[in-house]
């Protein structure tokens, strides 16, 4: 599964960026009306883009909205001929995670159509390299952003600098 780089057509490829659990209104507890409404909004955004001809969906696989995005793409794959490509910042990023997150992460990877690893080992720049790879290899960015500084904002700004189309999905 690793390094089996699937051919992607740029004009049919979307990448995703969003916050990790600590910046989410539901703080990682995926229950309640606020979370369910967010999940519906994100699913609708993905499905609308599928109807516009997007086929390839890149996920950075961070804990939080990336995993939600990935699971929604996998669910929609039952209905549409689409592909989930997981783009990891380095090998085995789940080694430091708790059991249930590790299991969820590995389940997504096992069901993904492809897995790309952008750096062999962890470094301070691993996540930035991964995010730039995703933006460089996509036509559009879907962003779930709550006005916090960090990787999500950096990815949005990088996509803007390249003139990429950006679609925002509200966290609230």
Regions found by a protein language model. Give the residues of each.
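N-terminal amphipathic/basic-hydrophobic helices that include classical n-h-c signal peptides
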Residues: 1-7
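Acidic/glycine-enriched connector segments
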Residues: 7-172
């Amino acid at each position: 599964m690793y390094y089996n780089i699937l051919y992607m057509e740029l004009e049919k490829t979307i990448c995703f960026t969003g916050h990790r659990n600590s910046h989410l209104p539901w703080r990682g507890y995926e229950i309640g009306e606020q979370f369910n409404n967010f999940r519906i909004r994100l699913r609708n955004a993905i499905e609308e883009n599928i109807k516009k001809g997007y086929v390839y969906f890149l996920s950075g696989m961070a804990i939080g909205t990336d995993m939600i995005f990935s699971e929604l793409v996998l669910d929609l794959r039952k209905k549409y001929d689409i592909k989930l490509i997981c783009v990891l910042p380095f090998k085995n990023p789940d080694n430091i995670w708790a059991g249930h997150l590790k299991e969820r992460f590995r389940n997504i990877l096992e069901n993904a159509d492809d897995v790309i690893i952008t750096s062999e080992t962890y470094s301070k720049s691993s996540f930035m390299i991964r995010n730039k790879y995703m933006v460089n290899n996509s036509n559009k960015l879907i962003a779930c952003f709550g006005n916090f500084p960090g990787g999500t904002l950096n990815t949005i700004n990088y996509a803007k600098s390249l003139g990429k189309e950006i679609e925002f999905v509200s966290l609230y």
